[in-house]
Every structure is written in structure tokens, then in C-alpha cells.
Amino acid sequence: MKIDKTLVVKFGTSTLTQGSAKLNLPHMMDIVRQLAQLHQAGFRLVIVTSGAIAAGRHYLNHPQLPPTIASKQLLAAVGQSQLIQTWEKLFAIYDIHIGQILLTRADIEDRERFLNARDTLRALLDNQIIPVINENDAVATSEIKVGDNDNLSALVAILVQAEQLYLLTDQQGLFDRDPRKHPDAKLIADVDKITDHIRAIAGGSGTSLGTGGMSTKISAADVATRSGIETIIAPGNRPNVIVDLAYGQAIGTKFSVQADRLESRKQWLYAAPSAGIITIDAGAENAMLMQHKSLLPAGIVNVEGRFSRGEVVKIRTQQGKDVALGMPRYNSDALHLIQGKHSQDIEQVLGYEYGAVAVHRDDMIVL
């Protein structure tokens, strides 16, 4: 039986370089072997990868550049293509396709871009293609940067509704003291709640090659666990670490979820103001409530209010009962045009399409 579970795995620069000044191909080959094993077992995988700047520096033979943002962006621009080619060639050994996505904070904070990014990720995963994600360092300014791939990976985990997020690093996990200064430091195996004490012992930044230290990993774990995603900080150089984590072995530091994924989503939908009303027929009501199906345009009989794609709306029966809250894939103007029509007619009517459904079941809470 295949496993239906979504994992986001973040690889830091130190993990991919193994402490050197370039990508460590033998180590990356072993990483891909593990990911291929999980992919073939049915896990839905998303990679968040660092390493573009290190790859660019090596490709350009370690040029002497001033320590400016422009220099880093130059290295990222050159190195990103080298980095993605490396992932692509290694996955090709196992006949697995990957898809590159470069994100900035603006892509996540803007509703339309957020939905587009989410839909792209879903499409890749639904077609057994592994998304490989990095921040778009070559063009991002400080105002639109997420800032580090730890926090980016947490946001990506929310985008794809992952069950788990793995932050792989050059450390064994979170220790009660800095193990580089205190040889007797003890590994903290489980963190039930991220407190000020946990943040304090996380300390500052990590290696010089990357931008993320233990403190950014704690920040990422906080974001993810509040959204119902279990997060684990684990050593990227441990043999078979990804496979072992996926099958439940205790490695590194595990951060327990702070809220159930569905409950977290329910609270958000309940709290959001309703921007409009979609009235549905009896067939759509039965499909949604009894069969847990998405809402199709064919089942819509009326659309009230003006709303954008992704705003929260009430879904109401013809008897006037509110039965669900949802985030439609189309704005109110588009829904007016396609209501009552078959899904295959959407593109012909609108000139574009965001999928066959009006409101996806994953974006809907039944009341």
C-alpha cells in the first residue's frame, strides 16, 4: 500500500557542501537516493534547497568580490542554475522529474501570487514531480526577502499542507547549550512548546556559507508547528537520515504541533470576514456534505458580493442555510460567468482556467 504523506525537506548550505566550499556530489547523490526511495514508496516530497551562492562561487573559481548584496546576488544568479542542474542530473538517475520554483516574500504575502504558487506546487505533486524551491536571491531585495530558507521552508510546508518539515543541518539537533563551546551539552530530543528559554538557548547564526543558524530554525519550527506541522531538526550527514525520519525513527530534535492542522485552518476560515455568498443546488450540497467533494461550477446557482480569488465566502443552500466556508479559485465576476456550466467549458468561457473546481475541498470547511 502506498503512503499518502507530504514531507518538506530543507537542506542547508552546510549539509550540501559538507563543510567544503562547493557542493558535495557524493553526499548529494546519497540524499537523492533516500528521496527516490521515499518517492517510490508514495511520499509526496518537496525540497527547499540552499547552496546557490556556494555553487556560484565555485563555478566562478572563487572570485574576489566586494562584500555587497550585489555580489551575493551575482553569485546566486550564476549558482542557481548550477544547483538545479545538479539536482536534476541526480534525480534523472532514478527517472524522477523535478520542477524549480523560486520564491520571494511577495509571492507568499500577495493573495493572488500565494494561490498561484500553491496551485503550481499541487500540480507538480499531483503529477509525481518533486518541487525544488529556493528563495529568488538574484532579484530579491531586503524588503521582499523571507531572509533564510528555514523560514521559507516553513511557509512552503503550509502552502502544501505538509504533515512534517525536516530541517537538515550540520548540527545533531537543538542542545541545552552550544555544543561547540560546551562538550557536555545535551541534545534536547523533544520540544513540546517553543518558549523564550528555547529561543534563548538556540543562540545566533550558524556557518559563514549560509544565512540560517539554530535561531532561524526555531523560528521556522514555531511557524510550522502553529499550523499543525510537526518539525524536526536533524543532522544532514547522518546515514539514511531522511528515510529513517520518514518512517518514524527518533533523530535530532522533534517539535510537537501546537495546533491540529484542520483546527488551525478552521480557526483561520472562521475568523476571516466573509466577502460574499455562493448559493448551490441540491446535487452540489450532497456532493460536498455527504461525499466530501469539491464544489464544481455546475452546482452553483447564484453568486452574491464582489470578491477576489482566495477570499473567504459563505456557501449556502437554496433553502438559505450556510453549510460551508470556502476560498474560491475564481473571483466573483468569473464565477458569475461559469456558474451552472460544466468544468470543461471554463477555459472557453473565461479564456483561462485555474482548475476544474470552483472551491477545492482542501479550501473548504463544512459547518
Curated annotation (Swiss-Prot):
Coiled coil: none annotated. GO terms for cellular component: cytosol. One of its GO terms (biological process) is L-proline biosynthetic process. It holds the Pfam family AA_kinase. Its main location: cytoplasm. Its EC number is 2.7.2.11. It is found in: Cytoplasm. It comes from the Bacteria. Gene3D superfamilies: Acetylglutamate kinase-like, PUA domain. PROSITE patterns: GLUTAMATE_5_KINASE (PS00902), PUA (PS50890). Residues 275-353 form the PUA domain. It is an enzyme of class 2 (transferase). InterPro entries: AceGlu_kinase-like_sf, Asp/Glu/Uridylate_kinase, G5K_ProB, Glu/AcGlu_kinase, Glu_5kinase, Glu_5kinase/COase_Synthase, Glutamate_5-kinase_CS, PUA. Pathway: Amino-acid biosynthesis; L-proline biosynthesis; L-glutamate 5-semialdehyde from L-glutamate: step 1/2. ATP binds at K10, T169, D170, T211, G212, G213, M214, S215, T216, K217. Substrate binds at S50, D137, N149. Keywords: Amino-acid biosynthesis, ATP-binding, Cytoplasm, Kinase, Nucleotide-binding, Proline biosynthesis, Transferase. GO terms for molecular function: ATP binding; glutamate 5-kinase activity; RNA binding. Belongs to the glutamate 5-kinase family. Catalyzes the transfer of a phosphate group to glutamate to form L-glutamate 5-phosphate. This is Glutamate 5-kinase.
